[in-house]
Amino acid sequence: MQVTFTLVAALAGMASAAVAGERGSFGCATHEPTLEHIEISKKLAEEEATNATLFGLAAAATITVPTYFHVVASSQTVANGYITDKMLSDQLAVMNEDFAPHGISFNLVQTTRTINPTWARDGDELAMKRSLRKGDYGALNLYFLRDIGGAFGYCYFPTTASPGSASYIRDGCTILSSTVPGGSSTNYNLGRTVTHEVGHWFGLYHTFQGGCTGSGDSIADTPAQSSPSSGCPVGRDSCPNQPGVDPIHNYMDYSIDSCYEEFTPNQQTRMYSFFNQYRA
């Protein structure tokens, strides 16, 4: 079932700015959401609370995402990013396992393999994606690269993007190839980097977005968090004056892969809201 929600027209236009900003160089390198995109999330939160029954129907629906894997390596060795079919199959299984409780599944349509040392180290992103990208704006393209400048991955939030535009072409997630199941990134090689980044593709922010004050990640059932977690610090409470302890098991924190367990019900609703608004 597909349920589409209409935001104020001006807000839809604001989303075109959502891909602005700088990527970091530690952990997740997804752009910080712009003020305009944060405003869209706040409005969605208001609509979700006001129309709980309608949004509940959306969250009870199912989404099947056409998915394309692009392996971009500097040579035909795993060490240089040429990950195996088994590693990719295991990665897809992790994605489907993590999102299945929320009615979301990923159907792998095609896998491409490219040897290009420049692209394999995240050089000339737009040219690479212009050459490799498949499907429409509702299709998920994952680019597995050998080196992303010290980061594990980055992705792009849903936005208003016309076919052929830079925002449309850049859409998708770039993933460090050594983070897939069986990869060499210690503590981060169970495939949960993809789960985290795809959460961004569905419009979710980090659980520590905004720190201890304000609207945070604009999700009512994720406790406030002042900063990213490291490892799996059970009981960590970085916002002691706010309800709850840090959501260290949430896929949108920075915990190690074995610590990750969940998206919340309100995160599920938000994923459906953004998908139906921009990608359906």
Swiss-Prot record:
EC code: 3.4.24.-
Glycosylation sites: 51
EC class (word): hydrolase
One GO term (biological process): proteolysis
Predominant localisation class: secreted
SS bond list: 232-259
Domain of life: Eukaryota
UniProt-listed Pfam families: Peptidase_M43
Active-site annotation: 197
GO terms of molecular function: metal ion binding; metallopeptidase activity
Protein name: Extracellular metalloprotease GLRG_06286
Taxonomic source organism: Colletotrichum graminicola (strain M1.001 / M2 / FGSC 10212)
